[in-house]
Structures are given as structure tokens and as C-alpha cells.
């Protein structure tokens, strides 16, 4: 059975065979669905401050 993963930045589903998995030196992994998410994470932007992420949508509804 193929596992689907979710993007650790924006929360979108990642299709099998796509996306990027980044492994830190301590062994922890981070999954990104696109280069857009990866670059925003590298720039240090918080997902709750970016309009197009799931975390931002949750804050707006509350």
C-alpha cells in the first residue's frame, strides 16, 4: 500500500513519487510538497503568517 504524506509547511497532501524529503543531521525529516514551501521554510517564514497555508486558514476562521 502506498503511503500519502502531508507537507510539513502548508499541510497539503503529497502524491507518492513527488515532493521533497529533507533529512536533518539529527535524523529528523521534513516533507515539502513544492519548492515554494521549501523556500519559505528556508527563509524562516512561519506558516501561520503566510496566507495560502492551512494554518493561516484555521486562524482566520477563529
Curated annotation (Swiss-Prot):
Single Gene Ontology BP annotation: translation
* Positions annotated as zinc finger (C4-type): 7-37
The UniProt keywords, alphabetically, are:
Metal-binding, Ribonucleoprotein, Ribosomal protein, RNA-binding, rRNA-binding, Zinc, Zinc-finger
Q: Per the annotation, how and in what number is the cofactor bound?
A: Binds 1 zinc ion per subunit.
Query: Which amino acid positions bind Zn(2+), per UniProt?
Result: 7, 10, 33, 37
CDD domains linked: Ribosomal_L24e_L24
**UniProt cofactor(s):** Zn(2+)
Pfam families attached here? Ribosomal_L24e
Q: Does the keyword ATP-binding apply?
A: no
What's the domain of life for this entry?
A: Archaea
List, in alphabetical order, the Gene Ontology terms for molecular function in this entry. rRNA binding; structural constituent of ribosome; zinc ion binding
Alphabetical GO CC annotations of the entry are: ribonucleoprotein complex; ribosome
Q: Which family does it belong to?
A: Belongs to the eukaryotic ribosomal protein eL24 family.
Role, per record? Binds to the 23S rRNA.
How does the record describe its quaternary structure? Part of the 50S ribosomal subunit. Forms a cluster with proteins L3 and L14.
Q: Which NCBIfam families match?
A: PRK14891.1-1 (NF034186)
Q: What is this protein called?
A: Large ribosomal subunit protein eL24
The record's gene field reads rpl24e
